Every structure is written in structure tokens, then in C-alpha cells.
């Protein structure tokens, strides 16, 4: 594997993973809020 390919792909994969993590966290918070709202 060419090191230049790793240098180019690493930040893209890191940014993509970070975005998925943040979106997933926000979605879980919304689901929890919706469930708690239904129970109240």
C-alpha cells in the first residue's frame, strides 16, 4: 500500500467516522427525549 494513499485517505476516514459518531449520538439523544416525552 502506497503511503501517499494512506496520507490522503486517513483524514477523510477520520472525518467521516467523526461525523457518523456525532450524528449517531444526536439521534440517540432525540430517541431518548421522545421516549421520555411519551412517558411523561
Curated annotation (Swiss-Prot):
TM spans (from-to): 5-23
Q: Do you know which InterPro entries this protein is assigned to?
A: PSII_PsbY
Q: Where in the cell is it found?
A: Cellular thylakoid membrane
Q: Which GO terms describe its biological process?
A: photosynthesis
Q: Does the keyword RNA-binding apply?
A: no
The cross-references to Pfam families, in alphabetical order and at most eight, read:
PsbY
The membrane topology term of the UniProt record is: Single-pass membrane protein
Thylakoid among the record's keywords? yes
- Tell me where it mainly resides: membrane
Q: Give the UniProt keywords, A-Z.
A: Membrane, Photosynthesis, Photosystem II, Thylakoid, Transmembrane, Transmembrane helix
For molecular function, the Gene Ontology terms on record are: manganese ion binding
Supply one GO CC term from the record: plasma membrane-derived thylakoid membrane
Q: How does this protein assemble?
A: PSII is composed of 1 copy each of membrane proteins PsbA, PsbB, PsbC, PsbD, PsbE, PsbF, PsbH, PsbI, PsbJ, PsbK, PsbL, PsbM, PsbT, PsbX, PsbY, PsbZ, Psb30/Ycf12, peripheral proteins PsbO, CyanoQ (PsbQ), PsbU, PsbV and a large number of cofactors. It forms dimeric complexes.
Role description = Loosely associated component of the core of photosystem II (PSII), it is not always seen in crystals. PSII is a light-driven water plastoquinone oxidoreductase, using light energy to abstract electrons from H(2)O, generating a proton gradient subsequently used for ATP formation.
Q: Which family does it belong to?
A: Belongs to the PsbY family.
Protein name in the entry: Photosystem II reaction center protein Y
Species per Swiss-Prot/TrEMBL record? Synechococcus elongatus (strain ATCC 33912 / PCC 7942 / FACHB-805) (Anacystis nidulans R2)
Quick one: which gene encodes this?
Answer: psbY
Amino acid at each position: 500500500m502506497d503511503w501517499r494513499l494512506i496520507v490522503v485517505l486517513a483524514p477523510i476516514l477520520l472525518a467521516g467516522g467523526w461525523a457518523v459518531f456525532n450524528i449517531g449520538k444526536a439521534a440517540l439523544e432525540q430517541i431518548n427525549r421522545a421516549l421520555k416525552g411519551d412517558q411523561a
